[in-house]
C-alpha cells in the first residue's frame, strides 16, 4: 500500500472525498433535518410600522424676518395692531346690581354706534356695579356723558367718566387777550424782550435808542447849539469811517 507521501495531490483529494461518503452538500444550501423558514428580503415591501413623528422638511424658500413688513402693511392698509383698541371708552360706575349687558346696550346705543359694551362681573357671576362702553366716534361719547351722567338708572345715579387721553381738554382762558394786552390795547409787532418797542423815537437815549443826541447826564440838560451838533455829526461820521 502506498503511503500518503507517494500519492499525488489529485489522489489525496479523491481519497478524502471517498472517506467522507461522497461529495457533501454544497456550502450554503443548509440541508439539515428539515427545511427551516427562510426570510425573503423583498425590496418592494413597505414597512407598516408608523414612525413616532415625522421629520420636518426644510422650507423651499429662504426665511426672512417679516415682523416689520407686517407692521408696515397694517399701517398702509389702515388696520390697527392687535391689542390696540380704537374709539372712545366710557367707564360707568354706581350701577344697580340688577343692570345687565342688554340694559347698557339699549341705553347707550341711543346716542351713537357702540363698538363694545360690557358689565363687569366677579367670579361668582355677581355684578360689580360697573360697566364700560366704547363708542366709534368721540362726539357720541361726549354726548353720552352729557346726557346720562348723574342720571338715575334703576334708582341709582350713574357716574360716567371718559377713559384714556382721547379727550382734549380746553385750554384755560388767559388773562391777556389774544389780540391785545391786559389793558385792551392791541399789541404792536416787533417788541423786544424788555417790553420796549424796537427802534425808539428820535432823541431817545444814546445810539441804542435810535436817537442822535447826547445821553442825558445827572445834572440839568444843557442847551446844544448848531455848531455842537455839526461837530458831533462830524465825529460820528469820522468814527464810522475809521471802523470801516
Swiss-Prot record:
A single GO molecular function term of this UniProt record: RNA binding
GO cellular component term of the entry, any: nucleolus
Pfam families with a match to the protein in the record: FoP_duplication, RRM_1
Function: Export adapter involved in nuclear export of spliced and unspliced mRNA.
Chief site of localization: nucleus
Gene coding for it: ALY1
Family recorded in the similarity comment: Belongs to the ALYREF family.
Skewed-composition ranges (Basic and acidic residues): 67-77, 220-244
Domain RRM: residue ranges: 88-165
Region (Disordered), start-end ranges: 1-82, 169-244
Any GO BP annotation: mRNA transport
Listed CDD domains: RRM_THOC4 (cd12680)
Ranges of compositional bias, category Gly residues: 21-35, 187-211
Modified residues (N-acetylserine): 2
UniProt key word ATP-binding: no
Designated name of the protein: THO complex subunit 4A
Keyword entries, A-Z: Acetylation, mRNA transport, Nucleus, RNA-binding, Transport
Protein's cellular compartments: Nucleus, Nucleoplasm; Nucleus, Nucleolus
